[in-house]
From Swiss-Prot:
Iron-sulfur in keyword set: yes
A molecular function (GO) term: cysteine desulfurase activity
Binding residues for [2Fe-2S] cluster: 334
Pathway: Cofactor biosynthesis; iron-sulfur cluster biosynthesis
Role played: Master enzyme that delivers sulfur to a number of partners involved in Fe-S cluster assembly, tRNA modification or cofactor biosynthesis. Catalyzes the removal of elemental sulfur atoms from cysteine to produce alanine. Functions as a sulfur delivery protein for Fe-S cluster synthesis onto IscU, an Fe-S scaffold assembly protein, as well as other S acceptor proteins.
Organism domain of life: Bacteria
GO cellular component, one term: L-cysteine desulfurase complex
Protein name (database record): Cysteine desulfurase IscS
Record carries keyword Signal: no
Encoding gene (name): iscS
Organism encoding this protein: Rickettsia akari (strain Hartford)
Subcellular location: Cytoplasm
Length: 410
């Protein structure tokens, strides 16, 4: 239930990595395609179909422009999970009789890791690269992992849990030099940081509508045409989307994604400035008021709409309950129902005692300075109270090493 407090609507939304609110301009553009402009974009014999097809193609070109791609290289899907599966499994199925090795990273999104585990059962060899304590891969490790059997390297642009930005340009250069396809899950970076598929030598890129103030249920896969990348489709049917993704296209959702991409293209600089300012305000004010708060992942390069913080001596779950006026999560939305510490934080070498205390705060286009100040005040007062009640915090103050404590499974 929403409630009002000093012109603030509570709870305050700070979970922008899980999803973003629909931009009102996106909503406005979509509405006619639910009502009067309802044609099937594949109907070639009348104006309803032509009108829908025109709208779809305009959206496709807007999405392409945001990442420097050719319009024909964008395939519409239901979202980034499907795009990741299509890219990874599609390449493996098409090229699997020639090569049998894929490289990814231990801290990738769960859908990438699960697609790779599925392929392992099919006989494909997968290398999971480690990350440094700052969450970023070592390029030397990637170079050493590539063999003449490697067909694909999959590394995300911006991590969904900790916001660090991987060195895509350097990874792309390495892959191109070795004749290996480079796939990137850019869902958390699309429209938020500059990404150019040609400059970065990206061959496949997965995007999502609802991470950029667009609708849920729509995403895309960029598939390079030159040099050509082939993927075996996951879905068979009418052969839409260059034969890679059959099914009637959802025109209203595609229009929404296109407008969201257009807004991101023209307002990225403004959004970045806004988010960076609020990130600094939030982090500096927290650090000035409470001790033993750690930012997980590199501060730079990072998408600053993501603050993953560990509050030493307090359980993450109890923090979430205490700050229920803030909509936040511990870990990614896909796995936050689990009480296990985040596998992303563990992959960075963060111990259980700190991994258990982490909260992800998201800042976005519609976050206000007033909301940030309210959040800081609430967090500081609640952490203070929780620490007074916390035996862990007491033990830390007494100099007991929490790393030596045996944690019971929940």
């Amino acid at each position: 239930m929403n409630q009002q407090l000093n012109n603030l609507t509570l709870p305050i939304y700070m979970d922008y990595q899980a999803t973003t609110p629909l931009d009102p301009r996106v909503m406005e553009a979509m509405l006619p395609y639910f009502t009067t402009k309802f044609g099937n974009p594949h109907s070639r014999s009348h104006s309803f179909g032509w009108e829908a097809e025109r709208a779809v193609e305009e959206a496709r070109s807007r999405v392409a422009r945001l990442i420097g791609a050719d319009t024909k290289e964008i395939i519409f899907t239901s979202g980034a999970t499907e795009s990741n599966n299509l890219a990874i499994k599609g390449v493996a199925k098409f090229y699997g009789n020639k090569k049998n090795h894929i490289i990814t990273v231990v801290s990738e999104h769960k859908c990438v890791l699960d697609a790779c585990r599925y392929l392992e059962q099919e006989g494909i060899n997968i290398t999971y690269l480690p990350v440094k304590p700052n969450g970023i891969i070592a390029l030397e490790t990637l170079k050493n992992a590539i063999t003449d059997q490697t067909m694909l390297v999959s590394v995300m642009a911006v991590n969904n849990e900790i916001g660090v930005v991987q060195p895509l340009k350097e990874i792309g250069k390495i892959c191109r030099a070795r004749g290996v396809f480079f796939h990137s899950d850019i869902a958390q970076g699309f429209g938020k940081i500059p990404i150019d598929v040609n400059e970065f030598n990206i061959d496949l890129a997965s995007i999502s509508g609802h991470k950029i103030y667009g609708p849920k249920g729509i995403g895309g896969l960029y598939v390079r045409k030159k040099p050509r990348v082939r993927v075996t489709p996951l879905i068979n049917g009418g052969g839409q989307e260059r034969g890679m993704r059959s099914g009637t296209l959802p025109t209203p959702l595609i229009v929404g994604l296109g407008v969201a991409a257009e807004i991101a293209y023209s307002e990225m600089e403004k959004d970045t400035k806004h988010v960076n300012y609020l990130f600094d305000r939030f982090l500096n004010n927290i650090h000035s008021r409470i001790s033993e708060v750690y930012l997980n992942g590199a501060k730079d390069p990072r998408y600053k709409g993501n603050l993953n913080l560990s509050f030493a001596g307090v359980e993450g779950e109890s923090i979430i309950l205490a700050i229920k006026d803030l909509a936040v999560s511990s870990g990614s939305a896909c796995t936050s129902a689990s009480l296990e510490p985040s596998y992303v934080l563990r992959s960075m070498g963060i111990g259980e005692e700190l991994a258990h205390t982490s909260i992800r705060f998201g800042i976005g286009r519609f976050t206000t300075e007033q909301e940030i100040d309210y959040a800081v005040n609430l967090i500081c007062s609640k952490i203070d109270k929780l620490r007074k009640l916390s035996p862990l915090w007491e033990m830390m103050q007494e100099g007991i090493d929490l790393k030596k404590i045996k944690w019971a499974v929940h």
